[in-house]
Each structure stands twice: as structure tokens, then as C-alpha cells.
């Protein structure tokens, strides 16, 4: 009969095994979110530019990334980047580059939808004031679009945090890896995986509640 014993879980286990992985997962999530939004914004602007030389490459990149499983992209970057630059870069840096490149495709779609949600009248008003395309986007469109996109950005960030567990494929020490090592060392793999699931649930559920609160505030502002 299966028996579960969670008494082994203590502060020492957390500091020795879990904390390091948690910090890396959070760091990877934050960097990938910021980097993904920056790159994704450029991709979205390229797709909305109307210039074939910009639209086609950006569309190809976004569609390709969105059509390939993340774990495959993680493995590709980990194996191919060292070959291209002639030296190893390590699992942590490889994971960071991969997540920025991968998430940029998803954030670009969010940004594109956000820009398109801004009333055309706002754009025409900017043009009537003599603004260039760049000024119109920077001063009129993007500020309104980003306010509308904040809840969706946060939702995608929650998904991103969950996806960081896939870096186990290249040996990076993330939150799940910390629980896995603790389970092996303490001889309690089942219990540690249960605790890992509970930890992910608590973090993601808390963030989802924050998203709902922000959505309500954005709706009130509108």
C-alpha cells in the first residue's frame, strides 16, 4: 500500500534544493517576458508595416515558432548555438536565449492584436497633427495598446513560468529540477513531485488572481 510522508520537508530542504531552482525559474520568467515583449513588439510592427520585405520574414518567424514544440526549440538552441559560435554557452544562457526567441512569437501576436484594438480615429488624429508613423505609434497607439494588453501579458507570463520546467531537457537547475534532486536524495520522489505540483499551483493561482484584479481595473479605466 502506498504511504505518503511529507514530514521530511523542512527549511533545510528548501534552502538546499528548492530555493536555487525557484530563483532561476523566476529569473528566466522575468527576463524572457521582458525580452519577449521587446522583440515581439518589433515583430508586430514589422507585420503591421505593410511592407512585404518586413511582413513576410516576421510572419514566417512567428508562424514557425508557434508551430514547433518548445522542448524541441530548447534542444535545438542548446545543440546548435555552440556549433555556430564555436564554444559552449551553458544550459542557463541557452535556456534564456531560447525562451526570449520563442516567447517573442507569442507576445508579438498579443501586441499586434493590442495595436489593432486601438480605434482608427486615434491614428487618424495623430496623422492630422502631422505625426510620422513612428511618432504616432510611440506617442498615441502603443501607450493605449499596452494598457489593454497588460492582463494578456500576465496570462502569457503565467504560461511561461509553467513552461520553464521544460529546461530539464538540457540539465538546467530550475524549480522542478530542485524538487527532483531533493526527492532522490531523501528517497521520497513521489512526495517531492506532489510538493512541486502544489508549489506551481500556488504560484500560478496567485498570479491568475492578480490578473483578474488588473482586468477589473483596466475595465473601470475604460
Segment roles from a protein language model:
Residues 1-222:
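Transmembrane alpha-helices and adjacent helix-loop boundaries
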